[in-house]
Amino acid sequence: MPFLHGFRRIIFEYQPLVDAILGALGIQDLERQEPLDDSASSEESRILVLTELLEQKAHSPFYQEGVSNALLKMAELGLTRAAAVLLQSGANLNFEDPVTYYTALHIAVLRNQPDMVELLVRHGADINRRDRIHESSPLDLASEEPERLPCLQRLLDLGADVNAADKNGKTALLHALASSDGVQIHNTENIRLLLEGGADVKATTKDGDTVFTCIIFLLGETVCGDKEEAPMINRFCFQVTQLLLAHGADPSECPAHESLTHICLKSFKLHFPLLCFLLESGAAYNCSLHGASCWSGFNLVFERLCSHPGCAEDDSHIELLHKAETVLDLMVTSSQRLQLPENLNIHPVGSLAGKIQALHASLRQLESYPPPLKHLCRVSIRLCLRPWPVDTKVKALPLPDRLKWYLLSAHSDTQDTC
């Protein structure tokens, strides 16, 4: 078996040379290695000992395998001077660890050694090479942990292909998103760096995963997961969504289960802040590819209202109604001419059924008449103030308070058509 054969070669063939190289550098145990004396004289003496050793062993059997394996150790420890000597002495940049199949460049990234990364690339290491087991490129590995941000920056500076994908279509941006849990791993800065480096927000894997797949999954975790973790996850999802939309991502595309806007509309009470941000940032409240015939925000909001019978003293239902009014108002002020879906039929029940019917009737009335001038002005001003936060920008306008009050979301009477 190739794996066992490679492992045997470490023990019986070139491991003695590797041990001698490590010993020359004062390294006895990689797992328990104390920081080396980094004074100039001490480092020079170690490099001198290493150089002499390599000259003595230059014609020994399995010499190149030994120095190449030792290069992996230098990459792990970030010993750039020693690595440079090994490279000059014949170390192979493409040599793979017999167990992990990582090259020195992969290992340098995993250990967050940006100077080592640059040294290896400058000496000809393939900056986009993928390992044989996971098909991960150095950029993929750098994107997966916040601590590897320095390596991520260095790789991008050195020309790594930010949109290179593995055989399944997964790019470094999708790696950064998929590796984030919103609690312990926050890859926000990694994601920001990749986007600023030109990462494609439309990247999609063969399984259909998009840049919003991770966010949708994490939002689902807030519903049935740890209540203490939910605020952290929501904050992470909000920040990443901001970044994605700023770089042109469309949260309203099909299919519906991969549409962040659709998910937030369906559970608008739970994801209210994020939904308001999406709508204020210009996200379509219908399917952006096929329109309302595919799915419509108006249908989703009223379906949610009608599925909650409630009672007169039910605070949760009153809160739901207030949030629905705000969301509907944001949708109304997203376009100068309101066009409701043809199949928007509602059948509310419970004590608040009358208010839901009135809300529906006000929208139908607004649709059936030419929009009043003040509505057109409100829509135009709010569109000019995009992106989010529109309400904050409204409050900063040099306008009378009454006019600001009308411009703010959910503060105008949707039944007023004069």
UniProtKB/Swiss-Prot annotation:
Tissue expression remark: Detected in adipocytes.
GO biological process, one term: intracellular signal transduction
Major place of residence: cytoplasm
Job description of the protein: Probable substrate-recognition component of a SCF-like ECS (Elongin-Cullin-SOCS-box protein) E3 ubiquitin-protein ligase complex which mediates the ubiquitination and subsequent proteasomal degradation of target proteins. May play a role in the regulation of cell proliferation and autophagy by promoting the ubiquitination and degradation of SQSTM1.
Domain text: The SOCS box domain mediates the interaction with the Elongin BC complex, an adapter module in different E3 ubiquitin-protein ligase complexes.
Family (UniProt): Belongs to the ankyrin SOCS box (ASB) family.
Record protein name field: Ankyrin repeat and SOCS box protein 6
Organism field: Mus musculus (Mouse)
Lineage, uppermost ranks: Eukaryota, Metazoa, Chordata, Craniata, Vertebrata
Chain's gene name: Asb6
